Every structure is written in structure tokens, then in C-alpha cells.
Amino acid sequence: MGQLLYTEQKVQTLEAAFLKQPQVNCPVVHRFGPGIYIREVSIPAGTLSIGHRQTTTHLNVMLAGRVIMISEDGVKIEIAAPQTFVAGPGRKIGYILDDMIWQNIYATDETDVEKLEAMFLDKSQTWQEHQKNQQLLLSFDHSEDVADYYAAIAEYGFDHDTVQVQVQNLDDQIDLPHGGYKMMVAPSKIDGKGVFATASLEAGEVIAPARIAGKRTPAGRYTNHSKNPNAKMILLDNGDVNLVAAMPIVGCKGGNLGEEITIDYRQALSLAIRRN
């Protein structure tokens, strides 16, 4: 065990320098159960990881790996899985010696990951500025996707206003069922909010239920249209609908979200007609 001088200013300086470097794959799986949210991150060996500040006291479980951790009070210690402990609010820096799987476990009934991050993670000013810059750099031209969206809904007799009324209708919406998901809803460059991969997805992998017993989950409500989609809707025998990856989809790198998950609304609307 050793003692290192630690200040938030120094951490943010280090954070800014590392954010300029290529980011490694850091898949995040969001797991939900009755009254519980588990945020599970996997980080490869050889990675220096700077965590967001945790805002609450909560349970931590290290399922696999070995890491040299520097806590907010400057204490350096090597820990190896398996470990289970309660940690208070604060920020950690770790150098991953062996591939690591870490779970932060929170007591909550909330299932909206965007809201959960706002509740439990305090993201630094350095990180927020980096994200804004990334958004400017990654402002792809989605005009073809938007034009194709209008064409797709017109083919089925809808206009944008009618679609928006349905999107905003709260009567047919339902939370995702308990389970683990490699996705979250976040602001989209295509339109409003979209669904993004937080861990890599393989072709044919079920991303999430999109419709259950006639009600839309967040995956059914927020998945945007693309002229070149990477996912599709699959109708099940019981009438429910799953959102499924149509090709490999890249997940989180560092703390950055992965690819936006998109579908062709023509394909989704054709399923709706079959279902009805």
C-alpha cells in the first residue's frame, strides 16, 4: 500500500490528456431486477481507467481481474477478484493488470439509464467539454436518413405529425422487463433521442424487447430510422416484437457511447400490419 498526492485538478488534467488518446473497448451491460440496478463494466488488461465520480454509497462487486486502485484520499492498493464491498461517494483511478469485470450496484426502481447516470454519476467538466467537442467532430450528415424516413412513412400513408403523436403517446408504453441490456437511450444526431449500443452486439443478437403485449418499450419507442440500418424488428409467435442486431454493432469505447442502433421503418411497419 502506498500514498499518492491526489487532487481533482490533477485528475482532470490526466483525464484531458487520456481523452485525446484512442479509447479501448469498455463494454457496459445494464442489469435490472426488483429494486436494483447493476452497472457492469468490463475493462481489458493494460488500461488506465479514470472513473466518473460516484454520488452515493453503494455496493461494489469485482467479478474478475486484478487492478491497482488509487482512491480519492490518495491510497494506492492492489486488489484482485473476487471482491465485494461498500464504497462511499468519490472517484477512483485504476490500472488494470488482468481483464476486469466490475459491478456498481444501486438500490433503485428506475430503469432509464440516462436518468440513472444523472442520479449516480457526476461527470467532470473536462469530460463534458470532451463530449461536446466529440459531438461537433462526429456531426455526420444524416440528411439521407431523414429524407428516407419521410419517404418510408409516406409509403404507409403517414405524415410526420401523425408519427409524432404516436411517439409521444404514453398510453402504450412500458418499461423494459428485468434483465440485462447492452443499450441505452441518449440524444441522437438523427432525431431527438435514439438507442445506442453500450457493449458490442453480434449479428442476430437480441438487443431488447421492443413491444410486449401490445405496449412499446424504450427500444420500440426510440429506435430511429436509417437508410442503412444495423438492426431490425422480429415478430414473435406470441405477437411480441424484439429489436435484433442485423450486423455487428460497436459498443462503448472508453466512456463514449457505441453506435446508434437503427432500423428501416418500412420493415417495422410491415410487421405492425402483420401483427394486426
Mark where each language-model region is.
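A short, N-terminal "cap"/entry segment at the start of jelly-roll beta-barrel domains
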Residues: 1-40
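Conserved short histidine dyad/triad with adjacent acidic residue
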Residues: 37-54
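Short acidic-glycine-tyrosine-enriched beta hairpin
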Residues: 40, 71-91
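Histidine-centered metal-chelating micro-motifs
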Residues: 47-50, 83-94, 101, 207
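A generic structural signal for residues embedded in beta-strands
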Residues: 51, 70, 87, 209, ...
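Glycine- and acidic-residue-biased ligand/ion/polar-headgroup-sensing regions
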Residues: 54-73
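Double-stranded beta-helix
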Residues: 97-141
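Conserved catalytic SET/PR domain of SAM-dependent protein methyltransferases, capturing the structural core
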Residues: 132-276
